[in-house]
């Protein structure tokens, strides 16, 4: 009986020792794996700039172009434009940098947020910019300063000569094309 008790005690001690060693090795190997894998956060592309031309009582072009900081561009033509629907293209890194430098050159962040008009028939040009953590939206109804008019013309000119791929017939600016 004494031998049986000793055998059980030795077996129990051996099992405990083996299980402790196994746990230590597992914990240590997990730590090594975690320390060898470097996590790099993935960021979603951010809107860099956009321009929207709104309706009037006549035949005013209605569209919105959105430029992302990774070069993706989405154009949504709504009415009185050659391309109706949602289109996409890519612009070069140089074009993205040119947009950024023009935001600064045209003093976009110094503009007023609204250039109003009491006349209801006038279309609006709505520009938005997001640069270095600063965001600004400007609604131009009629009497903007020269630098805002020039910035709007600049944004409109970027897609000239670019090949746009139609991705849907959707004309809602707030819906992301798939």
Task: Identify the function of each model-found stretch.
Residues 69-70, 90-98, 129-135:
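A short, structured loop/turn motif at beta-sheet edges
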């Amino acid at each position: 009986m004494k031998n049986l008790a000793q055998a059980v005690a030795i077996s129990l001690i051996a099992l405990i020792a083996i299980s402790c060693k196994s746990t230590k090795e597992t914990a240590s190997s997990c730590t090594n794996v975690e320390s060898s894998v470097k996590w790099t956060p993935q960021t979603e592309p951010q809107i860099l700039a956009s321009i929207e031309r709104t309706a009037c009582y006549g035949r005013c072009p209605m569209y919105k172009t959105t430029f992302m900081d990774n070069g993706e561009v989405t154009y949504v033509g709504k009415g009185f434009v050659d391309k109706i629907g949602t289109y996409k293209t890519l612009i070069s890194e140089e074009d993205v940098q040119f947009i950024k430098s023009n935001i600064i050159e045209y003093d976009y962040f110094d503009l007023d947020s609204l250039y109003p008009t009491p006349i209801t028939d006038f279309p609006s040009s709505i520009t938005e910019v997001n640069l270095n953590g600063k965001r600004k939206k400007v609604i131009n109804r009629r009497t903007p300063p020269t630098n805002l008019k020039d910035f709007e013309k600049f944004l409109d000119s970027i897609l000239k000569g670019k090949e746009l791929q139609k991705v849907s017939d959707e004309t809602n600016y707030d819906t992301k094309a798939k």
